[in-house]
């Protein structure tokens, strides 16, 4: 006998938690069930050590504003990401202010920096600063080529550096470090208190559509072969990180045809020595190597996890064919079907430089990887650093009418035409933009309900519907308020 519920959220990460809280705030009478394959929430990509924890607001990530062929830098994409992050930040602040989250310990003020180390990159960074400083959301950004000034911002990165090496840096004091695992756990605890059912150790075996339009999920208990649970729902969200593609394929919706995925592992060096970690307080992003994918931009980060400061450097690309860190090596081969084989082959052929880059990364020894760290922190001691494996990222491959198939970076919502099912595919900037992503998903799936949500959404997100960059006075007011509530 199937257990009926209004909403099923598959995946216990930041996306399901965010959507769950939004729906509970906007439709408090709806019954919601959250399913997670592991024994608790936030154990995969949302876990603090499985992502970089950057509050992606385009302050330091150079790949969000590349140099155009005409020599001009367009800040439009960076502004879009910054606006989205501020929507998330407002939502979190409201939940803290209303007592729906335990505290604001999930977010910390950590300056964001960009550091480059050759003349061409220094010239680019100057142009980027010139393009950004006129924008409201980037008005407090600083730029310098003065070694002493840069040393004040990031002393470890300048100590022992060749005096003749050109350097330039951007610095933004309003950057953040976010523990998305802690945030997810606080959100889910609130949901449980509101009657949301959480089912852990549940693997989705099958997804079927019934004649009346309801979705039926057959799930198995990963600890007990006889522990079957069947759920029947009118709305299904597939937010299982890298596992969402497999679930989307199981659903059989036509909108999911032609999608494929390519998994990339992330490796980082971690330093937990308090003496070293205490001397660096910034997230410092550099320039990606030629041919490298956007998620490979090197960065030396301050991380605040469970009240302790650490340093992380990376990422280094790795490859395993599983779509989740605790997934199966058969995930990739079993995801290849007739409808996505051609797009995947086309995307692979068109991205040979990326393939060569990944192969080169896989061949690197630990010593060769550490040499990259020395470029950013010249006096780093190998004994202080351990190499850790972060979460899996599954890059989207989708069919394209002109190219056959394209590799797409970022995140994408794939929804059934009638709004009864939606999946979230992709990676960065991901968690930082969870709130605007889930609001967009809700409007796409429940267009008839959207007008009745407007008033409450404006309470949850005070700047809802407003471009902060285009409304300076409102931006000052909202940014100051969220900074005060979140203590950042």
Swiss-Prot record:
InterPro entries: FAD/NAD-bd_sf (IPR036188), MQO (IPR006231). The keyword Magnesium does not apply. Keywords: FAD, Flavoprotein, Oxidoreductase, Tricarboxylic acid cycle. It comes from the Bacteria. GO terms for molecular function: 2-hydroxyglutarate dehydrogenase activity; L-malate dehydrogenase (quinone) activity. Pathway: Carbohydrate metabolism; tricarboxylic acid cycle; oxaloacetate from (S)-malate (quinone route): step 1/1. PANTHER family: L-2-HYDROXYGLUTARATE DEHYDROGENASE, MITOCHONDRIAL. Belongs to the MQO family. This is Probable malate:quinone oxidoreductase. It comes from Neisseria meningitidis serogroup C (strain 053442). The gene is mqo.
């Amino acid at each position: 006998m199937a257990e009926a519920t209004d909403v099923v959220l598959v995946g216990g990460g930041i996306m399901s938690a965010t959507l769950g809280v939004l729906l509970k705030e906007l439709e408090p009478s709806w019954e919601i069930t959250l399913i997670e394959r592991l024994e608790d929430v936030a154990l995969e990509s949302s876990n603090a050590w499985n992502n970089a924890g950057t509050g992606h607001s385009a302050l330091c990530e150079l790949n969000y504003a590349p140099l155009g062929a005409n020599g001009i830098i367009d800040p439009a994409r960076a502004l879009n990401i910054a606006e989205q992050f501020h929507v998330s930040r407002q939502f979190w602040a409201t939940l803290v202010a209303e007592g729906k989250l335990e505290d604001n310990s999930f977010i910390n003020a950590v300056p964001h920096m960009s550091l480059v180390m050759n003349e061409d990159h220094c010239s680019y960074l100057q142009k980027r600063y010139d393009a950004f400083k006129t924008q409201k959301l980037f008005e407090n950004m600083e730029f310098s080529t003065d070694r002493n000034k840069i040393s004040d911002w990031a002393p470890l990165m300048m100590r022992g550096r060749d005096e003749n090496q050109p350097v330039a840096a951007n610095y933004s004091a309003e950057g953040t470090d976010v523990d998305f695992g802690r945030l997810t756990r606080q959100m889910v605890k609130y949901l449980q208190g509101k009657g949301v059912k959480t089912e852990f150790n549940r693997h989705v075996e099958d997804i079927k559509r019934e004649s009346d339009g309801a979705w039926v999920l057959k799930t198995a208990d990963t600890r007990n072969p006889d522990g079957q649970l069947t759920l029947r729902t009118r709305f299904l969200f597939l937010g299982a990180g890298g596992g969402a593609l497999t679930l989307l394929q199981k659903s059989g919706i036509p909108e999911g045809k032609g999608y494929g995925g390519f998994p990339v592992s992330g490796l980082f060096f971690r330093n937990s020595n308090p003496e070293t970690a205490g001397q660096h307080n910034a997230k410092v992003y550099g320039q990606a190597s030629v041919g490298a994918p956007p998620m490979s931009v090197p960065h030396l980060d301050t991380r605040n996890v469970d009240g302790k400061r650490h340093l992380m450097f990376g990422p280094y690309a790795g490859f395993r064919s599983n779509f989740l860190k605790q997934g199966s090596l058969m995930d990739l081969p079993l995801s290849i079907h007739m409808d996505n084989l051609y797009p995947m082959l086309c995307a692979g052929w068109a991205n040979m430089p990326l393939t060569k880059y990944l192969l080169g990364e896989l061949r690197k020894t630990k010593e060769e990887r550490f040499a990259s760290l020395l470029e950013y922190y010249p006096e780093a001691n190998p004994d202080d650093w351990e190499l850790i494996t972060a979460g899996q990222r599954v890059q989207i491959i989708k069919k394209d009418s002109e190219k056959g198939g394209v590799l797409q970076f970022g995140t994408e919502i794939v929804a059934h035409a009638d709004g009864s099912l939606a999946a979230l595919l992709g990676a960065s900037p991901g968690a930082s933009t969870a709130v605007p992503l889930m609001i967009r998903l809700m409007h796409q799936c429940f267009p008839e309900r959207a007008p009745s949500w407007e008033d409450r959404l404006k309470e949850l997100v005070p700047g809802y519907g407003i471009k902060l960059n285009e409304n300076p006075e409102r931006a000052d007011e909202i940014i100051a308020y969220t900074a005060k509530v979140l203590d950042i």
